[in-house]
Amino acid sequence: MTLLCRPAILSRCLPLCREIPNPRKGDPAMRKALKILLVLLLTVLVLAAAYVAYVFLAYYRIEDQQVLTVEGSVTETLRPGQTCRAISYNIGFGAYESDYSFFLDGGTQSWAWSEERLRENLDEIAALLQAENADFLLLQEVDVDATRTYHFDESAVLRAAFPDRACVYAQNYDSPFLLYPFTQPHGASRAGMLTFSRYAVSSSLRRSLPIEGGFRKFLDLDRCYSVCRLPVEGGKELVLYTLHLSAYSADGSISVEQLKLLLADMQAEYEKGNYSVAGGDFNKDLLGNSAQWFGAADREYTWAQPLPEDIFDGTGISLAAPLDEKNPVPSCRNADAPYHEGQYVLTVDGFLVSGNVTVEEAAVLDTGFAHSDHNPVSLTFTLNAG
């Protein structure tokens, strides 16, 4: 079929064709706006790529078997048959007061409330530990220079509180600047673990722990445990370990691998005839099922799994989980909200001992989570003679 273009039809179509805009002759203001938008988008992409490169380039891990400095001039030595007391306390970088929630746990805060409140809380933590007067202090999450704690050296406060103790610092966190949350970036953090001893420490070592690979390694600490060697009369040693195992992992298996490495070290010392005691934050449900003791069971919280039942088989090492069955107190609260009645709580802090160490008591010190998302835990133990 042949279509004939009549003059009347053409006269109607031509004005419409003239109204179709030519993209090459667009509105100057529109072209300028598009250019600005493209420049902004390109700038954002370049900055994002530069930040990712910075995070990757800044990442490093401290080598295994790092020799640690033992501070202080303590000379008193232990003896077989002696009873001692140790306290382990994750101080939550001094920020986790009872009204605090942390953004990585689903809460709101990324910094301590204020530098003034931070210093007051640290003074109260130091006073609490002084009043307990334990022989050994095993402390985790101690900031030495961090955006989140106003670049205040928390270790200086704790060292000043125990000037007559031997002291060992082991770094396990040195993160690049974290830009999130955007309203108050978490920033850069350098932190670690402190060990204080009333008795002489002859040497100390830092053991690096395995961590997850891929992107998750940027979310985890540079996990480790410190090893302090204390002479005991008669030629033996007390080998004291301070630890903080992984929490933010895909399925919790990496912390089991970390624990196996620690157990192998402790077993080797025990087989030499030395005493082995370890304490810290395991990030595992050390009671197996904390909900049966404290209630508030919630399947949403799966970050702290029970330890494998057979993990201690053949090691000569046993778990000393702090529990008073008549008055059970948890050692940790979930930090997705300020502390409140019915909040998810459990026990993740505790101790390991070798077969030649008798556990007299393992207990949680009930602070009501006033200073941290953890309560301190204590172990009274005896170094068996013979």
Q: Where on the chain are the PLM-derived regions?
A:
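Surface-exposed cleft-lining segments at the edges of enzyme active sites
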Residues: 109-114, 142-144, 209-217, 244-253
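Short proline/glycine-enriched turn/loop segments at secondary-structure junctions
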Residues: 216-217, 337-342, 366-371
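Short, Lys/Arg-enriched N-terminal segments with co-localized hydrophobic residues
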Residues: 9-29
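Active-site beta-strand/loop signature of hydrolases that rely on acidic residues for catalysis
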Residues: 85-91, 121-151, 196, 228, ...
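Beta-strand-turn-beta hairpins that frame and shape the catalytic cleft
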Residues: 77-86, 189, 193, 197-203, ...
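Conserved beta strand-loop-helix elements of the APE1-like EEP
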Residues: 160-163, 187-204, 343-358
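Metal-dependent phosphoesterases centered on the DNase I-like endonuclease/exonuclease/phosphatase
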Residues: 250-355
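N-terminal, active-site-proximal structural segment of metallo-dependent hydrolase catalytic domains
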Residues: 32-164, 169-190, 385
